[in-house]
Amino acid sequence: MVEENNLEKGISAIIPTYKGEAFISKLLDSLISQSIDPHLFEAIFIVNGELDSTPDIIKKYQEENPQINIILTYSEPGVCNARNAGIDIANRQYTIFIDDDDYISYNYFEKLYQYAKPNRIVIGTFLDVNENTGEIQESYLSKPLLESSGINTNPYPD
């Protein structure tokens, strides 16, 4: 585990993956298109469980995009094991978790980093999209739920 005073500026994105070959490229594309300086984030992919071609896809992106710090490692099966393995090697000030079937907006890291401060939790928005129809579905964390919890759901404009 990296000591807190040895952390670099920026964001460590911890991304557990299990048989993600069908959708990992979309996430990788969204990572390489980030508007933030690529030196301010690292993407830590943790393969947990059975192997498919996901590690090969990640390695290809590593080779084609050397400006992005992409780390590939392996853990015991299970998303919790993978996240813990990622936390152990993360070396940035802030840590986020991204699922392997997600993709993020081009300014996701920039906005998170802009609003991140010590002892503050920054929560980004998300949408559930039906891949077959493109229909946006109700999210599990609905705006009314967040608002009733006292969480500011939109502290900055798009």
Q: Predicted segment positions?
A:
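Short, well-formed alpha-helical segments that are part of the catalytic scaffolds
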Residues: 20-34
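Short beta-strand/loop segment that forms part of the nucleotide-sugar
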Residues: 39-50, 71-75
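Cell-envelope/extracellular polymer assembly enzymes that use nucleotide-activated donors
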Residues: 9-12, 42
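Conserved donor NDP-sugar-binding/catalytic core segment of glycosyltransferases
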Residues: 107-139
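Short, flexible, basic/aromatic active-site loop/helix in glycosyltransferases
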Residues: 125, 139-158
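Glycine-rich, basic loop-to-helix element that forms the pyrophosphate-binding segment
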Residues: 74-90
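Short aromatic/hydrophobic "clamp" motif used to bind/position activated sugar donors
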Residues: 95
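A conserved acidic beta->alpha catalytic loop
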Residues: 47-56, 99
